């Protein structure tokens, strides 16, 4: 077994994609992944920016039209088995970006939640969700990774 295969087998590699929003969820995702308080590296959860090395795709924010194709390409580049986490209310249901009412009307700049673009395995609601909730959501996605 080569070095790359060994590393992939013995760790979970998470890739984070920020689509559109206030960045509150992005901060909490990074707190969950990189903060010494949670220290996920001790559990072999590592951050990657290469979709070919990722096992878990973490998406935050409502998806604008400009991100549809890039998000699909990233998803397709991640090898099986893979899990997708939609983190935050914007990623889960579109939140204020798609649910505008009154004089403002419907926002035509956004597609909506992540599941309208790619399949989502775990939804972590909240504005912004706590790092503990993000970690719990990631744990719920682990069984799918173990299927292969």
Give each language-model segment a name.
Residues 1-148:
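Iron-sulfur-associated redox domains of electron-transfer enzymes in respiratory
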């Amino acid at each position: 077994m080569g070095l790359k295969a060994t590393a992939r087998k013995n760790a979970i590699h998470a890739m984070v994609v920020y689509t559109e929003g206030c960045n509150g969820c992005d901060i909490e995702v990074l707190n969950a992944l990189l903060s010494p308080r949670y220290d996920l590296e001790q559990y072999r959860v590592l951050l990657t920016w290469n979709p070919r090395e990722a096992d878990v795709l973490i998406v935050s924010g409502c998806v604008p039209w400009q991100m549809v194709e890039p998000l699909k390409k990233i998803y397709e580049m991640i090898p099986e088995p893979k899990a997708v986490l939609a983190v935050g209310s914007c990623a889960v249901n579109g939140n204020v970006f798609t649910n505008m009412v009154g004089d403002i009307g419907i926002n035509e700049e956004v597609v909506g939640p992540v599941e309208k673009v790619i399949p989502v395995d775990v939804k972590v609601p909240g504005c912004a969700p706590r790092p503990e909730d993000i970690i719990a959501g990631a744990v719920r996605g682990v069984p799918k990774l173990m299927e292969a």
